[in-house]
Structure formats: structure tokens, C-alpha cells
Curated annotation (Swiss-Prot):
Keyword Nucleus among record annotations: no
Compartment(s): Cytoplasm
Top class in the EC scheme: transferase
Gene (UniProt): lktC
Keyword Acyltransferase: yes
Reactions this protein catalyses: a fatty acyl-[ACP] + L-lysyl-[protein] = N(6)-(fatty acyl)-L-lysyl-[protein] + holo-[ACP] + H(+)
Protein name according to UniProt: Leukotoxin-activating lysine-acyltransferase LktC
Amino acid sequence: MNQHYFNLLGNITWLWMNSPLHREWSCELLARNVIPAIENQQYMLLIDNDVPIAYCSWADLSLETEVKYIKDISSLTPEEWQSGDRRWIIDWVAPFGHSQLLIKNVSEIPDYSRQIYTLLSKTKRTGKIAYFKGGNLDKKTAKKRFDTYQERLGAALKNEFNFTK
């Protein structure tokens, strides 16, 4: 670990402290969600005039890890952050209203020619899977990939939870 690493951690922690949702979370959850992102360079931190304004992190999950994550969002281990090709937004912090700027910047990342998933929660108790198309991905290809993704995830969840028709 070096000074740059600690500066990143400090900037991200400051954003968490200014987020109504994140400020309630524990230091353990901060470490679990932020340190693997920094170590794997799977994050974006926006800074304006030397002040952090927004942050997001992502993990590339295998189908098995994805099912585990959907069941328990605090279940990711550091090794699982790069376990597959199913990209998930793990953390999104924009306490000063810079979400649109963060979306614009994330969609311009060259390897974002894929779809991105996240769990959204309005109640903090339940979430829904949201889907975003990477900026370099055309709509037709994105739809085809999303349909395939839904089929594979649906089958895996059905198997995991023993759902029947």
C-alpha cells in the first residue's frame, strides 16, 4: 500500500460520510466494498477542484457468484471481484448530485461495451436488478445479450431457490 492508495481510501470514505445511505454503514462494510475495488482498479472517482464529488465501483462476477451476491449483497470476497464477465455496480456514491456526470464518465470507459447490472433499493430492505447498456454497445446487441443474461440468471436462481412453475 502506498500514499496514493490511502488518498483514494480517504476520498471515498469522505464521500461515504456525506451520503445519507452510506454514512450509516460500518467500517467493515466500507472495507469490504471499497478496498477490493481499489486493489483491482475497478472504480471511478470524480474529483472537482481537489474535492471528491462522486464514486462508483464494479465487480465482474461469475454466474455462481452473481447468484450468491443477489442473495446476500455483503457476501462478495476479494477473490470474487474478478470471477467472471457479468459486470455489477457494487457501490454508487454521489451525495452532491453528480450521478449524471458519473453515468456519463462510466459509459465512456472503453471496456464498457457490455451491459451493467446493479441492485437498486428504495426501502433498504428489498432491491431490484437494474440493467444499463455500456456506451459502446449498440441497442440490438445489448438486447440480445440481456435476453441471454436473463435466461441464464433466471435458470440459476430457479435452481438455487428451488422455484417451481
